[in-house]
C-alpha cells in the first residue's frame, strides 16, 4: 500500500523566519498521526504548510508534500480548489473559525457541497442527513435551522466535523479539535473521529498538546520540539518508552491519575 501523504525535508515559516525545519513523515490511508509538543514548537505551522486553506497559508522554503501521488505544493488553482475541502478537510480548534455566524448551518452545508458538486436540494438534504446520522447527531432540523451561535460549543464542534467529512475526504487535518471542550464532550468527539476512520478509512493528522488525546486517538505519534521532529513511532512505544530527553520531560510533566488515566496539565 502506498502512503496517502508524504512530507519530505519540509521547512516552512513566515516572512523569511523558519518555524519548522527538515520535517519528513508519511501517513498511510486510514492512519491517525498525533503531533504533540509544547506551544511554539511548530505544530500548527506544519498543518498550515500542508493545508493550503485560504487564510492559513505559510511560506514553504524547502521540501515536498505529496498527497495521493500529486505534488500538493505545485498544484494549479483549480486542482487546489478541488483538493481542499473535497479530498483534504480542516478541523479548527474553535468552531467559530469554520462556521459563519451570519448564516444558518444548513446554508453552510449547501455551500460546501455546491462548491465541489452539482446536486439538487433533495440530494443535498439526504447527504447531510446521512452524515449527521453517521456521527450520531440527532435533531437534524433544529441544528440545520440554527445559527452557529445558537449551538453549544460541543455541538458546534460536532457540526464542524460533520462539515469536514461531508464529501468523504481522504485526509482530515485537525488542529487541537477538542481543547476548547469539556472532558465529557472531548471523549464524544474523539470517539466520533475514530468511528469516521473505521467506517470511511479517513486518515488524520491531529495536533494536540494533550498527551491523553494522543494516546486515545493516534496510531503513531510525532514529537515536535523547536520546529523539528525529535521522536516518532507507534503511540504506545513513544509514550511508554520515550527515547529523546524532550519526550521524557514531556511525559514526566503529565499528572498521573487513578486507574492509569492521564489528564492534561
In which residue ranges do the predicted regions lie?
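A short, proline-enriched helix->beta-strand linker immediately N-terminal to the Walker B motif
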Residues: 166-170
Amino acid at each position: 500500500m502506498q502512503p496517502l501523504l508524504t512530507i519530505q525535508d519540509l521547512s516552512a515559516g513566515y516572512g523569511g523566519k523558519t518555524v519548522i525545519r527538515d520535517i519528513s513523515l508519511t501517513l498511510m490511508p486510514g492512519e491517525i498521526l498525533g503531533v504533540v509538543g509544547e506551544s511554539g514548537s511548530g505544530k500548527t505551522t506544519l498543518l498550515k504548510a500542508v493545508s493550503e486553506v485560504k487564510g492559513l497559508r505559510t511560506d514553504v522554503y524547502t521540501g515536498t508534500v505529496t498527497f495521493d501521488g500529486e505534488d500538493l505544493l505545485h498544484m494549479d488553482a483549480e486542482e487546489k480548489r478541488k483538493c481542499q475541502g473535497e479530498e483534504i478537510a480542516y478541523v479548527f480548534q474553535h468552531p467559530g473559525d469554520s462556521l459563519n455566524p451570519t448564516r444558518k448551518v444548513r446554508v453552510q452545508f449547501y455551500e460546501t457541497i455546491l462548491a465541489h458538486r452539482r446536486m439538487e436540494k433533495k440530494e443535498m438534504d439526504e447527504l447531510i442527513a446521512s452524515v449527521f446520522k453517521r456521527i450520531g447527531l440527532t435533531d437534524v432540523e433544529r441544528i440545520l435551522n440554527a445559527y452557529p451561535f445558537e449551538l453549544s460549543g460541543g455541538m458546534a464542534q460536532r457540526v464542524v466535523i460533520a462539515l469536514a467529512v461531508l464529501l468523504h475526504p481522504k485526509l482530515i487535518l485537525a488542529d487541537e479539535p477538542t481543547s476548547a471542550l469539556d472532558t465529557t464532550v472531548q471523549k464524544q468527539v474523539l470517539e466520533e473521529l475514530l468511528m469516521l476512520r473505521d467506517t470511511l478509512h479517513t486518515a488524520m493528522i491531529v495536533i494536540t498538546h494533550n498527551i491523553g488525546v494522543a494516546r486515545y486517538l493516534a496510531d503513531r505519534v510525532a514529537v515536535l520540539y523547536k520546529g523539528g521532529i525529535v521522536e516518532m513511532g507507534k503511540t504506545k512505544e513513544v509514550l511508554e518508552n520515550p527515547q529523546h530527553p524532550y519526550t521524557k520531560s514531556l511525559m514526566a510533566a503529565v499528572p498521573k491519575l487513578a486507574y492509569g488515566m492521564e489528564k492534561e496539565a
